[in-house]
Amino acid sequence: MARNDWINSYLEAILDVGTSKKKRFESNSKIVQKLGDINSKDHQEKVFGDMNGKDHQEKVFSPIKYFVEEVVNSFDESDLYKTWIKVIATRNTRERSNRLENICWRIWHLARKKKQIVWDDGVRLSKRRIEREQGRNDAEEDLLSELSEGEKDKNDGEKEKSEVVTTLEPPRDHMPRIRSEMQIWSEDDKSSRNLYIVLISMHGLVRGENMELGRDSDTGGQVKYVVELARALANTEGVHRVDLLTRQISSPEVDYSYGEPVEMLSCPPEGSDSCGSYIIRIPCGSRDKYIPKESLWPHIPEFVDGALNHIVSIARSLGEQVNGGKPIWPYVIHGHYADAGEVAAHLAGALNVPMVLTGHSLGRNKFEQLLQQGRITREDIDRTYKIMRRIEAEEQSLDAAEMVVTSTRQEIDAQWGLYDGFDIKLERKLRVRRRRGVSCLGRYMPRMVVIPPGMDFSYVLTQDSQEPDGDLKSLIGPDRNQIKKPVPPIWSEIMRFFSNPHKPTILALSRPDHKKNVTTLVKAFGECQPLRELANLVLILGNRDDIEEMPNSSSVVLMNVLKLIDQYDLYGQVAYPKHHKQSEVPDIYRLAAKTKGVFINPALVEPFGLTLIEAAAYGLPIVATRNGGPVDIVKALNNGLLVDPHDQQAISDALLKLVANKHLWAECRKNGLKNIHRFSWPEHCRNYLSHVEHCRNRHPTSSLDIMKVPEELTSDSLRDVDDISLRFSTEGDFTLNGELDAGTRQKKLVDAISQMNSMKGCSAAIYSPGRRQMLFVVAVDSYDDNGNIKANLNEIIKNMIKAADLTSGKGKIGFVLASGSSLQEVVDITQKNLINLEDFDAIVCNSGSEIYYPWRDMMVDADYETHVEYKWPGESIRSVILRLICTEPAAEDDITEYASSCSTRCYAISVKQGVKTRRVDDLRQRLRMRGLRCNIVYTHAATRLNVIPLCASRIQALRYLSIRWGIDMSKTVFFLGEKGDTDYEDLLGGLHKTIILKGVVGSDSEKLLRSEENFKREDAVPQESPNISYVKENGGSQEIMSTLEAYGIK
């Protein structure tokens, strides 16, 4: 019955909390009644605040929640049942008895609900494992079917070994062997490479000096990592410029420096042609508001367009400086975390350059951990952390990434292994096939490499590694007259907490987060009397002014720490300063080292553990969690002990062992200093650039060119200089690539020159795309219920062209038609409705997989086809997609190939109405599990599925044209309906202006976009954007013109 006594006491505590709250509220209400209008709800909320409101919940710790969680998590249903029986047997007419019975029922219900959540989660994980195994088996069968009999035998008999690339090995006397297929980066022969590298870290507060690490959950170790990486890469021979892109923040809540567009991180070395490294701040979202990372998702397209403008500008400028006028495109685009990974994926696709990803912290791993705890439902997890949106961003990043940089092997196996887009077994098989020169049948897996983060050793003084005796008496004595050296201010701030500051210091440095497990450390220290007698504890937990003003999660951790200090009476033994500068962190490490102390990282899970490396550099032995990256760090440095973060006794034993055993302490210090070079930034950069260069060998070189635009529009001209082809050909008339033979070339050249002279000054002249000042894009998905293009497209186009003529006049605005239909379908419908396609500068067809130019005899853009073909499975996708598209068996003619719309870059499938097909997110998931990377779009009112290359889409095609023609996306106007194909959301976000025409779309395909369990539209598209306007139903050219004028287009 002891367990039931605990339950009874918890229930009584809940009743007491509820009663006291009610009494306090009633008392306050009486006071207000005397003061004024108690019937005014607004007045009550003004005086008290909303008792159930979000702000109130963030500021006040809930005892009820604590006791309920204890009951639900600590006891089973039988205990709750016994308690309920007891309550029923002893109940009476008192209100408290009835409330107790009611609480029993409610908590019993919560316990059963938790049990159901755990059960559902187990079923979900089991189903997912089966699907992943099926995907891998399908891929292996397809791959095996293409091998010859001899190759099959060899494949069956060969025992494959793990080939995960790592640069983190146990200490050896010789250098680790470099694999033969990868050459180590040598600075001697790379000095003339002039590489341009782009790093992206979107969220948090990013600046080069006085970093506010720990200010909030978004400003942590990742900020320091990316800043130091940018500096280190810029100091590497062969690297010309490094840009670190982040979000511009002009909010009064933060320092003005976060609103500066450009910040130089490092100056180029003297006598060098290098440009150095810079922080580039890109505006996105509300510029005067600090937006946490969970709310940044709708603003990613805007960041992509802004970043693209910057990169194109820098590429052009660098090309003029050092490359004879030819643009220098980024050598690699590296995204950090899920949001920046998605940005990098879009940029890499638009520019056709390699992309690298570093996850830092992974959403799926966090999601599974939260579900296992059982304290919060799946819906609440997604509502709080936007976890489904984050996971999809990570999957998209895996699709596009050439390489994924990890800190440890554990991150590969236990974290990335949870994702649809990475299967370590399939990745090994594909790598073996590539080495043998055997086709992978369009399947692809990113390469995982382990490259530990580097450290900036510039703050480490020579004496930090030379002084074996760290006695504080050499610096501070009991009398101020004994001070021999200047004392760092942070030392005084810390030592004021201690009754004896000379004792060894146990140092913990992290943000106040539940995951960092600081409370367990305080408990371990408080309950170990020998440790308390021997050492002091220093807790550096970010910066704060008032605990009440901190985020809820941080304030709860700090309050718990303060309560534990009081509970164990640790006054004079624990320091917890309110403020510290980033520049003072080295002094904090020095203080611990000079007192012969220990650094501890007791986090529940630590992805890497950069602070452990920093501590080792200052000669501090370490105690670290055994979960995650510290395992590899301790293995490499051999300078400390690993512990179970849940075991208080193990933590106190490890700390006591290192502090009390002087010989062990000295040995750990010596080993750490000896092996720390393995984590230097130069070593990190050499390994990083070696792997990037290896990955670039299989990535096509970008041939993207930018049309040169004359400074002044001195005359009218043809559409494009390519239209007057000066290339010779042995073929007659036009060849397949648009070249002319000698005779035709001469005739066209003469005609063109004559036309230019005759049309000079004529108002009806047509400017080239490179001379357009704006672009108007018609992307209305107007279909009837049968998937046929509606005739109202004609009226939409005419209204748009007329409005353009009324605002800016002919020639200044170019027109683009973007559709999910094939070229032939577009031609048929426009001819039927007497639309002149030559009014358009480009036609984007088949959901963005093809671009045609009407003014060049409808010639296809072959460069764009090459631009998007990388990772395109081609013919290999046909049989797989036909197997996967239906949710249940279908008749043979229900799902058929739509041959007239198929092309080299688009596989079109016709879907009969009423057939149950998988949604886009489900299909994409199953293709990822099989190593196939594609973009999937339902169009024509969900009667057709277009399977196109990964980097192809309508929005990416328009970004491609924007780069080629030198027209910023901010100078582009999209005309859309209120709904459309499943890529409709992609067209809403970004720097471009959007005019939504009401009532023009009949049937759409968006019901097949994603399942109810996935993220919602508000997580992908800004709900209130100044760039989106509406034109009422049946609105004509005048209404469109008025909307354009509201955008400042006149």
UniProtKB/Swiss-Prot annotation:
Matches recorded under PANTHER family: SUCROSE-PHOSPHATE SYNTHASE 3-RELATED (PTHR46039), SUCROSE-PHOSPHATE SYNTHASE 4 (PTHR46039:SF1)
SUPFAM superfamilies given in the database record: HAD-like (SSF56784), UDP-Glycosyltransferase/glycogen phosphorylase (SSF53756)
Keywords: Glycosyltransferase, Phosphoprotein, Transferase
Source organism (scientific name): Arabidopsis thaliana
Family matches, as CDD domains: GT4_sucrose_synthase (cd03800), HAD_SPS (cd16419)
Gene Ontology terms, MF aspect: sucrose-phosphate synthase activity
Reported regulation of activity: Activity is regulated by phosphorylation and moderated by concentration of metabolites and light.
GO BP term, pick one: sucrose biosynthetic process
Gene that produces this protein: SPS4
Pfam families reported in the protein's UniProt record: Glycos_transf_1, GT-B_Sucrose_synth, S6PP
EC number: 2.4.1.14
Inducing factors: By cold (at protein level).
Protein name per Swiss-Prot or TrEMBL: Sucrose-phosphate synthase 4
Modification sites for Phosphoserine: S148, S180
